[in-house]
């Protein structure tokens, strides 16, 4: 890279350069382990490779992106602290993004935060684009009892709100995102009231509020996202991120992760009950592989899935209706079937979001995409088209 991987040792009395402090933080994280808050997102993903301190300095030495979010079509992305490729994507490509959602903290059932400090992100992108996520995550799952306690127990809620505000102010972010999933159906009104309270608190501190909501095609009041009242919540929050993926998921029947007809139904319902310009469409950058016997089902990022196909002799087909790849093949585990998106899938969803005048799209998650995808996504952000 034209420079030594490690700088010479500092002379006595000389301040340690900022990147060295951040590398030290990362090394501490590597030894402490992911159990101290580097949890996976519920049912969707496994932990990826650990941090690579040899490469980290190169990214941290790049100029900090301090540009504000754009006024046109947005591209947002989710950053996770347990995968170095996610860090790389933010540092190198944040100039193509309008919001970076930091997959940050869970709660215990008393309203205390679970997770490690997100200080590293300060060296990666500017405050104007940072959004800090808080979810009802306990022991790596979206916990019903945690959600119920925060939404219905005033003392627990007070503690949770205080922790959200203090942590967000300390880190320095433009906004907060709430990702409460698997909420008890009877807590639907309580969830709406909680978001209304939080919106008031955050607005007084010049911070925005967004939520991550499970995809719906009607006002269903049951199921994984039944407690999210799209119409009511859509009037409260600044941005409404819809997780338009897991149409089929790892522990279910094989099928597209997010077929185009299904995604369009999700958009049509949402735009019928809230302003389109509040909606940010979640776009998956991953796929699933299922055993035909229902065993050893797995999730892979798009880059890893493409490599996976080179390890077998698959029959790969592009499904133009679903807008995804489908493949069948054999491994030592038996017959397998996989569905996953590629750049064509992402491009189709960008155009669909723009066609319906949405605020933009959000990528789950940063680090799953091949780097060359950003050429097209960055160009679309500047000059979107239907």
What is each model feature region?
Residues 39-163:
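Glycan-recognition patch characteristic of GH18 chitinases/ENGases
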Residues 1-21, 25-29:
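N-terminal Lys/Arg-rich, disordered targeting/topogenic segments
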Residues 109-115, 188-312:
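Substrate-binding surface in catalytic domains of secreted glycosidases
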Residues 349-386:
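Acidic/aromatic/glycine-rich contiguous surface patches that form carbohydrate-binding/processing clefts
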Residues 100, 178, 240, 281, ...:
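Conserved, mostly hydrophobic/aromatic
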Residues 49-54, 138-147, 283-351, 381-386:
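Glycan-binding loop/region signatures in secreted carbohydrate-active enzymes
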Residues 161-190, 242-253:
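Active-site groove signature of glycoside hydrolases
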Residues 80-94, 153-169, 221-231, 341-352:
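Short, acidic/polar
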């Amino acid at each position: 890279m034209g420079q030594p991987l490690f700088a010479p040792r500092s002379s006595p009395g000389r301040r340690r350069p900022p990147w060295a402090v951040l590398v030290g933080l990362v090394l501490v994280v590597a030894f402490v382990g992911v159990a101290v808050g580097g949890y996976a997102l519920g049912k969707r993903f496994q932990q990826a490779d650990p941090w690579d301190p040899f490469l980290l300095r190169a990214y941290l030495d790049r100029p900090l992106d301090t540009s504000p979010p754009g006024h046109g079509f947005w591209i947002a992305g989710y950053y996770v602290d347990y995968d170095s490729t996610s860090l790389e994507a933010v540092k190198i490509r944040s100039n193509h993004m309008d919001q970076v959602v930091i997959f940050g903290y869970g709660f215990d059932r008393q309203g205390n935060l679970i997770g490690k400090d997100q200080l590293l992100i300060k060296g990666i992108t500017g405050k104007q684009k940072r959004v800090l996520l808080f979810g009802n995550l306990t022991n790596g799952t979206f916990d019903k009892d945690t959600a119920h306690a925060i939404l219905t127990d005033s003392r627990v809620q007070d503690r949770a709100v205080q922790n959200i505000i203090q942590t967000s102010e300390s880190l320095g972010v433009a906004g907060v995102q709430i990702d409460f999933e698997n909420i008890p159906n009877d807590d639907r009104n309580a969830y709406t009231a909680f978001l209304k309270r939080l919106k008031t608190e955050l607005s007084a501190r010049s911070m925005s509020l967004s939520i991550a909501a499970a995809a719906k095609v009607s006002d269903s009041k049951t199921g994984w996202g039944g407690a999210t009242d799209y119409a009511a919540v859509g009037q409260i929050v600044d941005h409404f991120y819809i997780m338009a993926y897991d149409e089929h998921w790892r522990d279910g029947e094989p099928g597209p992760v997010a077929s185009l007809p299904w995604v369009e139904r999700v958009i049509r319902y949402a735009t019928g009950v809230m302003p389109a310009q509040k909606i940010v469409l979640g776009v998956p950058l991953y796929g699933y592989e299922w055993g035909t016997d229902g065993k050893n089902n797995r999730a892979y990022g798009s880059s890893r899935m493409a490599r996976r196909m080179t390890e077998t002799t698959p029959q790969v087909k592009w499904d133009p209706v679903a807008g995804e790849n489908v493949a069948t093949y054999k491994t030592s585990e038996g017959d397998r079937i996989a569905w996953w998106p590629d750049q064509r899938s992402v491009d189709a969803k960008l155009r669909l979001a723009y066609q319906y005048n949405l605020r933009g799209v959000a990528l789950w998650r940063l680090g799953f995409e091949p780097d060359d995808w950003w050429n097209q996504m960055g160009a679309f952000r500047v000059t979107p088209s239907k």
